[in-house]
From Swiss-Prot:
It holds the Pfam family EAR. This is Ninja-family protein AFP2. Keywords: Nucleus. Disulfide bonds: none annotated. It comes from the Eukaryota. Residues 247-267 have a biased composition (Basic and acidic residues). Acts as a negative regulator of abscisic acid (ABA) response during germination through the ubiquitin-mediated proteolysis of ABI5/DPBF1. It comes from Arabidopsis thaliana (Mouse-ear cress). Induction: Up-regulated by abscisic acid (ABA), glucose and salt.
Length: 348
């Protein structure tokens, strides 16, 4: 009885040690997936099969080497089972089949503007382009208008110079002197008056053919011719009446010239004392067979500007060489030496 009880106590002691070791091994499993699942706490561990296997396994009561920390456990009946992590990740087959999503949705305009805003934007762009074109057209018109005004001013300036020259005492002096000569010849005798009138008319015709101013001569020559013809026709009249008529005509001509000069000076401001002194009368006479005297006005010029002379007979601006050629002098090396300043002639 004593030996049996002793064996029973030893067997019970070994069983308690084995159970304690098995509990320690269960705390630290060799399966890594089981370790992760036990730490996360989300896995589902099935221990029912393990208990059955432990019950079925036979425990050997010997002092052999332990395998994996367990003594006397036969590992042969153990089977590798699917881990709980695999069960969690693999989805279960569902009987209800989900309908596929319909991706054929109508295309929407995302990048471009809506139709109304795009139309307004297009209209705004068109208005801006029209405004730009209008501004450009106005700019071009202003520039062309300025260029036209400058050309008109130069032409009008030259015309005004020509008008002042034609209305000056230079031309009137020649006309009045010719009238005096005609009238003096009329007072001497009838035949002489006839010859004088014809000679004066021929001189006037020659001057007109040489390019004298049409405006001035057309206005004044008919009156002079009419006066001369009337004087030549009246052969039996007395000398005092002729002299009175001549004086009246001279006074009228002088008054007309003075009034025109005063109007020209007031309206246009062309005649100033300094400007008139700076523009003296000049003339040249050609040496060739076609040489003739040509009168002109030396136009005022500054430093570095070209010298210009206004021809009285045509009213055109010429260089000194052209002015000498106009008088029939030909090509000369120094044309200014062939141009003489007329100091005796009265200024404007």
């Amino acid at each position: 009885m004593g030996e049996a009880s002793r064996q029973q106590r030893a067997w019970n002691r070994e069983m308690t040690v084995t159970t304690n070791l098995s509990l320690d091994i269960d705390k630290y499993p060799r399966d890594l997936l089981r370790g992760f699942m036990s730490e996360n706490g989300g896995g589902r561990v099935f221990h029912g099969g393990e208990t059955n296997c432990d019950d079925e396994s036979t425990i050997e009561l010997n002092l052999g080497l332990s395998l994996g920390g367990r003594f006397g456990v036969d590992k042969t009946p153990r089977k590798l089972k699917r881990s709980s992590s695999v069960l969690d990740t693999v989805p279960f087959n569902d009987s209800t089949v989900a309908e596929p999503e319909n991706y054929t949705v109508g295309l929407e305009r995302t990048t471009s503007l809506p139709a109304e805003m795009e139309e307004e934007w297009r209209k705004r762009k068109e208005m801006q382009s029209l405004r730009r074109m209008e501004a450009k057209r106005r700019r071009c018109e202003k520039q062309s208008f300025r260029v036209g005004n400058s050309d008109d001013q130069t032409v009008s300036f030259e015309n005004e110079r020509w008008v002042t020259a034609s209305k000056s005492g230079f031309l009137q002096r020649h006309l009045v002197s010719s009238n005096r000569q005609v009238c003096g010849v009329d007072s001497d005798g009838g035949g002489a008056t006839g010859g004088g009138s014809s000679s004066s008319l021929s001189e006037l015709d020659n001057k007109n053919q040489q390019g004298s101013s049409n405006s001035c001569n057309d206005e004044r020559s008919p009156k002079i011719v009419a006066g001369c013809s009337s004087n030549s026709g009246s052969q039996g009249t007395e000398r005092p009446s002729v002299t009175r008529a001549n004086k009246v005509n001279e006074n009228e001509n002088e008054k007309r010239v003075r009034s025109e000069d005063s109007v020209d000076r007031k309206g246009k401001g062309m005649a100033t004392s300094t400007g008139l002194v700076d523009m003296p009368c000049v003339f040249t006479k050609g040496d060739g067979p076609n040489g003739r005297r040509v009168d002109g006005i030396l136009y005022k010029y500054g430093k570095g500007e070209e010298v210009r002379i206004m021809c009285i007979c045509h009213g055109s601006f010429l260089t000194p060489a052209e002015f000498v050629k106009h008088g029939g002098g030909g090509d000369v090396d120094r044309p200014l030496r062939h141009i003489v300043v007329n100091t005796s002639s009265s200024t404007f």
